[in-house]
């Protein structure tokens, strides 16, 4: 789940999401799962030989429902539907891709996670199914790496918080820009009083090998961890100054391509 105060897919006629409306919530919006890269509002997908780039650039006014803006690259179900579509298209339409760079189109912000205002106005059923869907999308990224030979690199050009960092954790490698302010964070506990809802704590310990005591400290530190400390705690694989960031990502990408092709 996430951090910030603020979630796309164009609503077209389709199956209506189910959920009982309660006081303070809005009716579930009509959701269409039919999309393709030419219709994405929040992602850009490009393929160059064995390398693909997925850029998250969320349209603030592109939420599935009224009542919230998708600020700071936060996401709602519509954003994640596009991500799911892109991951599966890479597997089936571009099987020759060996490395996928997941990055942001916003300055100093990778992703602030699930949109809090969207969650606040949603029904309980919607929240549960939203978390399940986002989990399945991140599992799909890991499955593409394990079984389709497509490794993912999270190129964090800015802060990755809450569900934004959980998205990065689904990738094979994480590179964080070292600009003095960009951090990785799971601030759900100190800010919202809830546990991360998209596998963050499990992946920290089981996938990345973060020490449990450090994971506990990290999950109760609202401001997150920056720079070399993030690498020392195994929260990221490498940091790079902004001037060197593109070259470092290219190096990681080329190594992964060589490993997967070789």
Where are these regions (language model features)?
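Amphipathic alpha-helical segments at domain termini/boundaries
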Residues: 1-14, 24-63, 166-170, 211-262
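A structural preference for short, pocket-lining loop segments at secondary-structure junctions
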Residues: 49-56, 76-125, 135-155, 177-181
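A solvent-exposed, charged loop/short amphipathic helix patch at secondary-structure junctions
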Residues: 58-75
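Alpha-helical scaffold segments in soluble metabolic enzymes
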Residues: 89, 136, 203, 229, ...
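Hydrophobic, secondary-structure "cap" segments at the distal end of domains
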Residues: 199-214
């Amino acid at each position: 789940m996430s951090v910030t105060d603020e979630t796309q897919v164009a609503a077209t006629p389709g199956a209506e999401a189910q959920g009982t409306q309660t006081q303070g919530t809005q009716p579930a919006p009509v959701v269409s799962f039919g999309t393709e890269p030419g219709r994405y509002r929040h992602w850009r997908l490009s393929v160059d030989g064995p390398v693909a780039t997925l850029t998250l650039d969320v349209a603030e006014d592109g939420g599935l429902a009224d009542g919230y803006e998708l600020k700071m690259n936060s996401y709602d179900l519509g954003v994640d539907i596009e991500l799911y579509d892109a991951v599966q298209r890479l597997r089936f339409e571009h099987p020759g891709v060996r490395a996928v760079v997941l990055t942001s189109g916003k300055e100093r912000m990778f992703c602030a996670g699930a949109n809090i205002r969207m969650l606040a106005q949603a029904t309980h059923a919607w929240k549960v199914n939203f978390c399940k869907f986002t989990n399945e999308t991140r599992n799909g990224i890991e499955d593409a790496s394990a079984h389709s030979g497509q490794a993912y690199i999270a190129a964090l050009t800015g802060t990755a918080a809450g569900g934004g960092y959980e998205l990065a954790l689904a990738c094979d490698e994480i590179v964080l820009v070292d600009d003095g302010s960009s951090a990785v964070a799971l601030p759900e506990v100190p800010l919202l009083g809830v546990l991360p809802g998209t596998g963050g704590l499990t992946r920290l310990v089981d996938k990345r090998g973060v020490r449990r005591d450090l994971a506990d400290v990290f999950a109760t530190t609202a401001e997150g961890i920056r720079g070399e400390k993030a690498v020392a705690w195994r929260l990221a694989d490498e940091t790079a100054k902004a001037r060197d960031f593109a070259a470092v990502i290219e190096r990681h990408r080329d190594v992964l391509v060589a490993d997967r092709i070789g």
